[in-house]
Each structure stands twice: as structure tokens, then as C-alpha cells.
Amino acid sequence: MIRTEEMLLNVGPQHPSTHGVFRLVIKIDGEIIKEATPVIGYLHRGTEKIAESLQYTQIIPYTDRMDYLSAMTNNYVICHAVETMMGLEIPERAEYLRVLAMELGRIASHLVWWGTNLLDIGAVSPFLYAFREREMIINLLNELCGARLTFNYMRVGGVKWDAPDGWIEKVEEFVPYMREQLAGYHDLVSGNEIFLNRVKGVGIYSEEDAISYSLSGANLRCTGVNWDLRKDEPYSIYDRFDFDIPVGSVGDAWDRYVCRMKEIEESLKIVEQAVQQFPKEGAVLAKVPKIIKAPKGEAFVRIESPRGEIGCYIASDGKKEPYRLKFRRPSFYNLQILPKLLKGENIANLITILGGVDIVLGEVDG
């Protein structure tokens, strides 16, 4: 009888497939993972505590640096929370610009996930195609707000700048181009036998597991739970758009892949409709004081980011800074199921499973 010895192995914190400073301590017996322990906090910056000494507008750039692949949704959630407390009515043109910015950001975020996830499991060319299209989106957002990654675009009451001349037309032209490229992505990857063998039946969890671990986004919907805040608790102007919510059935890495790829298609639908409905004129910022003071009280709002439900709780004592601010960061919750998924798996599936969960370390650590 062959006797094997268990070994502790560190994955990270400097490891290309973790996409950030994330450490995973795994106990392996041969090639089987017996135990996995995530070690987080390497990127903790104390955002919530810092916010207690900042004016509300000053907090917005800090949200850019949480989920830095989807900064627009982070901008929105803090603004939405303050607007809810103040009872502000947002100009219609600003709402459309917000939706366009958030949905373009969602597509760009999923493209990063698609390209890097496939690169990690051995497919090189998809990474190049994904970043080619992402660069086009980044250029569009750069024209809109003057930044490529950390946008600081949204403001309490609307947005900082109106769309430049010709910008809406460029977005309109991008939609059919992206649809064509997406079909090419499926031809290249989605039916590839090697890829299917790497993802089908790997990292399975049930609907009950997803709910008990407070998963959200594609990590929840891959189990068959049809829940998306843009549909189920519409915010902004999402109730004006016709789009579907992709769901899976098995809850494996393949279902998570399919959900995110279909989400790109649905985001393109939203962008297309937003362009068609875009108001020809109007203000982009409500009349708000230069120094914003939220009234005494509390507010909690939540929205759908590319990684799931991001929430913002604010307690105000009537001053220009929040008394307490708390973010519900979806990557932090989604990461909790990783030890359960990895236990008993072959070590070769580790990166497939981690990539399928799609965490961003700036958001995990706060």
C-alpha cells in the first residue's frame, strides 16, 4: 500500500492567477485538496473608517478603488444612498448617462474575467481579443469622464459632465460590433472540447448553498435562482428597459461561464435601448448644495454590480461627513464558499474554480 504525506502549499499572495494580493493556504494529499484556507487583508485600506472624516463628494474616488474593474457601479451606490436620504430627484439625462456608464463598465468587467480566466487555464488568444474590445469601452468611458479605470464620474444628484458631442453615436456603433465579436468568442471557446472538460461538473454547489453563503450575481444565478436587483428591485431607470436575467441549473463553473457571457448580451440590449431613448437635452446634475449634508437618519441601498449585490449603509448625524458608512462588498461574500468548493477537488481545478468565482481583491479587503 502506497502511503502519502499531506503537504501545505501556499498559493499567493504574489501569484498571477489570483489577480491581486490574495493568499490561499491549501493542504494537499497527492493531487487532492483536503483543506483550503483563504488569507485576506493584504489590500485593506480602511475605506469605511476614512470615509467618516470625508465629505460625501470626497468619498466617491475611494469607491473607485474597491472594485476597480467596475468603478462606475461603486460610484453609483454611494451617490444613490445619499440621494435616498436627501430625497433628491435626478435629472432624466443624468440617469441615462449613469446607466450607459454602468452597463458599459459591466461589459468591460466581464471581458476582463473572460480573458484572464481562460488565460489561467491555458487559452492565450481569448485574452488578447477580450482586451481589444475592453480597450474600446475604456476609450468610450475616457471620452465621457477623462479617466480610464478610476472614473470619479458620478455625483450626488447626477453626473459630473455631460456626454461630449458624438459620444452617443459612438456607443451606438459599438453595440453591433460587440455582438459580432461575442459570436466569435463563442465559436472560439464555448464549444471547445478541452475547455468544456475543464469547467463542466467542476466546482458545483446547490441553490441552498448559494443562499446560505449569501452569494449574489452570477455566483447565485448559476444555481437557478432568478434574482437580479435591476429586475427584482429596480433602481435608477432600469424598469424602462426590456432585458432577461440569465440563470443556470447545475451550479458548476460552466454555468457561471454561461451566465456571465449571456449577461454581456443583455447589457448590450440595455445599452442599445438607452441610446434609443436618450433625451436630446436636459440637465445632468440636480440642484444640490456645494457642501452636501445628509439629514439625520439612516439609509441602506443595494444595486447589482458585475460581481453581485453591492450595498451601502449610511448613518448620518446631519453633518457634512457620515457618522458611519458601511459597504456590502459582493466579492467578500462570494469568496466565503471557496473552501467548500475546493475540498476534495484535484489541484488542477483550483484555478478554474477560483476564476469562476470572480473576485476582485480591492473589494474583498475594502
UniProtKB/Swiss-Prot annotation:
EC number of the protein: 7.1.1.-
Keywords recorded for this protein, A-Z: Cell membrane, Membrane, NAD, Quinone, Translocase, Transport
Subcellular location: Cell membrane
Membrane topology field: Peripheral membrane protein
Example of a GO cellular component annotation carried by this entry: plasma membrane
Enzyme class, first EC level, given as a word: translocase
Gene3D superfamilies (alphabetical): Cytochrome-c3 Hydrogenase, chain B
Reaction catalyzed: a quinone + NADH + 5 H(+)(in) = a quinol + NAD(+) + 4 H(+)(out)
MF annotations from Gene Ontology: NAD binding; NADH:ubiquinone reductase (non-electrogenic) activity; quinone binding
Predominant subcellular localization, coarse grouping: membrane
Coiled-coil annotated spans: none
Keyword NAD listed: yes
Keyword flag Ligase: no
InterPro entries given in the database record: NADH_Q_OxRdtase_suD, NDH1_su_D/H, NiFe-Hase_large
Superkingdom of this protein's organism: Bacteria
Family designation: Belongs to the complex I 49 kDa subunit family.
Function: NDH-1 shuttles electrons from NADH, via FMN and iron-sulfur (Fe-S) centers, to quinones in the respiratory chain. The immediate electron acceptor for the enzyme in this species is believed to be a menaquinone. Couples the redox reaction to proton translocation (for every two electrons transferred, four hydrogen ions are translocated across the cytoplasmic membrane), and thus conserves the redox energy in a proton gradient.
PANTHER family, per the entry: NADH DEHYDROGENASE [UBIQUINONE] IRON-SULFUR PROTEIN 2, MITOCHONDRIAL (PTHR11993:SF10), NADH-UBIQUINONE OXIDOREDUCTASE 49 KDA SUBUNIT (PTHR11993)
HAMAP family xrefs: NDH1_NuoD (MF_01358)
Assembly behavior: NDH-1 is composed of 14 different subunits. Subunits NuoB, C, D, E, F, and G constitute the peripheral sector of the complex.
Protein name as catalogued: NADH-quinone oxidoreductase subunit D
Organism: Bacillus cereus (strain ATCC 10987 / NRS 248)
Lineage: Bacteria, Bacillati, Bacillota, Bacilli, Bacillales
